[in-house]
Curated annotation (Swiss-Prot):
Residues 355-365 have a biased composition (Polar residues). Its EC number is 2.7.7.14. This is Probable ethanolamine-phosphate cytidylyltransferase. Pfam families: CTP_transf_like (PF01467). It comes from the Eukaryota. The keyword Transferase applies. Pathway: Phospholipid metabolism; phosphatidylethanolamine biosynthesis; phosphatidylethanolamine from ethanolamine: step 2/3. It catalyses: phosphoethanolamine + CTP + H(+) = CDP-ethanolamine + diphosphate. Keywords: Lipid biosynthesis, Lipid metabolism, Nucleotidyltransferase, Phospholipid biosynthesis, Phospholipid metabolism, Transferase. Residues 344-365 are annotated as: Disordered. SUPFAM superfamilies: Nucleotidylyl transferase.
Amino acid sequence: MASSSNIKHRLWLDGCMDFFHYGHSNAILQAKQLGETLVIGIHSDEEITLNKGPPVMTLEERCLSANTCKWVDEVVPSAPYVFDLEWMRRYGCQYVVHGDDISTDANGDDCYRFAKAADQYLEVKRTEGVSTTELLDRLLSSVPLEIYSTPVSVLSSQIDLLRRFATDSDGLTPFTDVFIYNTEKPETLISGTTLLRLNPEKNIIYIDGDWDLFTEKHISALELCTRMFPGIPIMAGIFADEKCFEKPMLNLLERILNLLQCKYISSILVGPPPASLFASSKYIKLCFDEQISKVYYPIFSTDVSIPALDISLSNTPNNSFYKFDKLGSDLIKQRVMLRRQHYEERQRRKMGKNATEQTTIKTYA
């Protein structure tokens, strides 16, 4: 963490941001802690394809994911793949931030060589154990869940990482509450500030699901809730790996971190059953020491032919979100499988680049 004397005003961080995961958000968080304003540049589909193979997510989807991260102040689409000092300066940024791994272009040259030569380069720690390449490998190779699963019981060993991700938009002060589901009473894993943000009626919205891959469908649902019901905090319930409706591509820890980085989420309940299978309203009130008056469950339009989601609030749990939860993940998985040969070739190219860059992609354990 930078001291106040070392804080920079405007910083630039760029990348593909494909399969937006906690490796991306951890780099963003570290960068935010170095400056006041963080601008994220997102590479175009064409430049990514040229330099490393086709992305899974479209430029629009990748920009949406970055915009949803609470530590991001601005997003610039179609940023050059090879870092350009003049491009960065156009947006008033003084330094570019990148992880401590080497990133090379199609010719094998360091993408940030010009920034380093100009002494306008800052470095943060690369996140080991997660990458777009790793996630694609899980899907293409049908890696068994037990290889990468994270049980609820080990989350306490990741408390420092979770607490960092539970910070507010400044990357420093507490924000998100995190609770662990136990049958008798909830366990507080991280204390946040949800109660301070309650509206005068002291209501909360609860949405539960697998939350796998954290797709455009998830983001659209959360944004709609926030826009239509301002002032009502959103609590996300997230199922344990073995309790998901279908095998998740991300493990529990990875899915929690995706929720924690999202600016729309105020609190998280880890490992509950589906809301309709337990006294969820009563239980959620227990999480907040009975200071919640009412728990609402959103009802989303289930007509996927309608371009815009429709939403209302109910006093009782329903299954409408599960359809969007599954649909978003399924669309991404189908996209990969339809272009399987392209992505397998991308994997081979990337692994070859890893050897050149001396980057080791580790399986999370």
